[in-house]
Amino acid sequence: MKTVGVLVFGDRRVPGSLSGLPVHRADGPADVDTAIGDYGRLVVVGADAELAAVLTRLLRADRLDVEVAYAPPRRTRATRIYRVPAGRRAARRARRGAARRVTLIRDETGSAIVGRAAWLPGDDQRVINGEAVVDDTTLFDGEVAAVRIEPTLAMPGLRASVQNGIWRRWVAGRAAQLGSTGVTVVRDGVSASRAARRSTFYRHVEGWLLVR
C-alpha cells in the first residue's frame, strides 16, 4: 500500500475526503522536495501551474515513480486533457484510484507543463518573428501573433497551434521547437522572467504516474 501525502498550495482548504492524511502546505520548491521523500503517492490540491511545479520537482529529482493525484477545486485545462474530475470527486479518487503512466511534456529547462504553454511576443514586440516546427512539420516561418502548445493524453504527446488573426488547426507531434528573435515563454499561465530566442517542448522519455 502506497503511503499518501497531501500537498496544499496557497490558502486552499483540504477536502473532507482527504481527512486523516498528512498535509503539507507548499509555498515553494523546498516544500515539494520535502514531501517527495516521504510518500509513494502525492495528492496535489492546487491549480495547473502548481501541479506542473510538482511534476517539475519529481522530474529533476528522478522520482517519476511517485504517483500523483490531482484534486483541484474546479475543472481546469489539465483535468480536461487528462480526463480526471475536480472537486469532491477528485479528492475521493485521489485515495482510491489506480495510477497509470501518461505523457509528460517538458521543455529544455526541465520544466513540465500540464495544461498549456505559449510563445508570445517578447518585450516591446507586437509579433513573434522566427520559425517553429512540430517534428518534421513547419508550424510557421515568418511572423505570427502567438503559438500555443498543449499535452495530449494520446501519443505522440503534444499538439501546437499558431494564431494569425485566428487560431489555425492543431499539429500533433513529439516535440515543438522554436527559433526566434525573442519570445516570452508562458507555462501554465506563468510567464518566464526573461525573453528567450529558442524554446522547445517535448515528450519526456518516461511519463508520470497519474491517479485516475
Positions of PLM-derived features:
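Catalytic core of DAGKc-family lipid kinases
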Residues: 2-38, 45-188
